[in-house]
UniProtKB/Swiss-Prot annotation:
It catalyses: N-acetyl-L-glutamate + ATP = N-acetyl-L-glutamyl 5-phosphate + ADP. The record marks K28, K241 as: Transition state stabilizer. NCBIfam families: argB. Signal peptide: none annotated. It is found in: Cytoplasm. Its EC number is 2.7.2.8. The keyword Plastid does not apply. Substrate binds at G63, G64, R85, N178. Pfam families: AA_kinase. Pathway: Amino-acid biosynthesis; L-arginine biosynthesis; N(2)-acetyl-L-ornithine from L-glutamate: step 2/4. This is Acetylglutamate kinase.
Amino acid sequence: MDDSLRVSVLSEALPYIQRFAGRRIVVKYGGAAMVHAELRDAVFRDIALLASVGVQPVVVHGGGPEINTWLKRLDIRSEFRDGLRVTDAETMDVVEMVLVGRVNKQIVNGLNRLGASAVGLSGSDGRLVEARPWGDGNHGLVGDVARVNPDVLEPLLARGYVPVISSVAANPEGESHNINADTVAGELAAALEAEKLILLTDTQGILRDRDNPNSLIRQLRLSEARQLIHDGVVAGGMTPKTECCIRALAQGVAAAHIVDGRVPHALLLEVFTDAGIGTMVLGCG
């Protein structure tokens, strides 16, 4: 990169750095960006940079591929119903071991290596997230968010720490549940009055035509996002992600972004450039 291009990049980023200093940005980390070493390192660098310029990032993660690997290694078969893993007690033990004890610490260590001050938590810690059964309760220990206690995170954020949160939480009886990480991220963003919710995915964002990669919708209003679901333009796996964004925006989050985590440094490109790279849904209209 020549000197003039470096200056151009920094000049474009500066207004956004100034705008978001001291603001909270909740990042749901998952998909290819969690699996491939180059992408993983780029995400860690992006989050560390956000923290270094005064933004307050909060990371929420799942860990589907790692869970699948360990279930196979332990010869535990998975049953899927309505697209969700039916989670019995044996499976839940593995989910909790992998998400809380392994994946969470890998993320924390990766961020700390780059100079961030990351702290690993699960939804159970300090009753940060209280779980309830998902849907009709026929999926075992698959959970939903009953309530969020953001007070757990406030002292950490005030002191410059980066909370890294696994999507495992307990119900009032102390029984652990596996909750969709998108859902946890959205509810935390609302409870923290975050400026942005960013979902790192394995798609470009919301497409006007699912068969046309050039039909990316770069910006939507809340009402338009709802209409796209109603019209079937948003369907399949994009539906729960869009609904997660809608719920967060309806509770006061300023903007939600669905971003292609397969692109190196997607996080910085979305936050600190004029064009961005994904779909931004605005909480107005």
